[in-house]
Curated annotation (Swiss-Prot):
Belongs to the PsbE/PsbF family. It is found in: Plastid, Chloroplast thylakoid membrane. It comes from Chlorella vulgaris (Green alga). Its cofactor is heme b. The lineage of its organism: Eukaryota, Viridiplantae, Chlorophyta, core chlorophytes, Trebouxiophyceae. This b-type cytochrome is tightly associated with the reaction center of photosystem II (PSII). PSII is a light-driven water:plastoquinone oxidoreductase that uses light energy to abstract electrons from H(2)O, generating O(2) and a proton gradient subsequently used for ATP formation. It consists of a core antenna complex that captures photons, and an electron transfer chain that converts photonic excitation into a charge separation. GO terms for biological process: photosynthetic electron transport chain. The gene is psbE. This is Cytochrome b559 subunit alpha. Heterodimer of an alpha subunit and a beta subunit. PSII is composed of 1 copy each of membrane proteins PsbA, PsbB, PsbC, PsbD, PsbE, PsbF, PsbH, PsbI, PsbJ, PsbK, PsbL, PsbM, PsbT, PsbX, PsbY, PsbZ, Psb30/Ycf12, at least 3 peripheral proteins of the oxygen-evolving complex and a large number of cofactors. It forms dimeric complexes. GO terms for molecular function: electron transfer activity; heme binding; iron ion binding.
Amino acid sequence: MSGATGERPFSDILTSIRYWVIHSITIPSLFIAGWLFVSTGLAYDVFGSPRPNEYFTEDRQETPLITDRFNALEQVKKFSEVN
C-alpha cells in the first residue's frame, strides 16, 4: 500500500469523544493561564519589559529615543537610571 503510514486519520481524531474531552479542558486552561500571566504583571518581570506606568518618569516626560548610535550604551544607561 503506497502512502500508508499506519497513523490514525485526522478526521477520526477530530470526531473522537476522547479528543474533545481532553481539549475542552486544556485549551481553556491555556487561555486562562496566559491571561493570568499577563494580567498579574508576571510577564513584565519575566521578560524585563517596563510596565505601562514606567515608560515616563516625573523628571523625564519625553520619549526616550536613542539618537547617537556610537554612544547608545551611555544613552540607555542615562534613560534607565532611577532618580
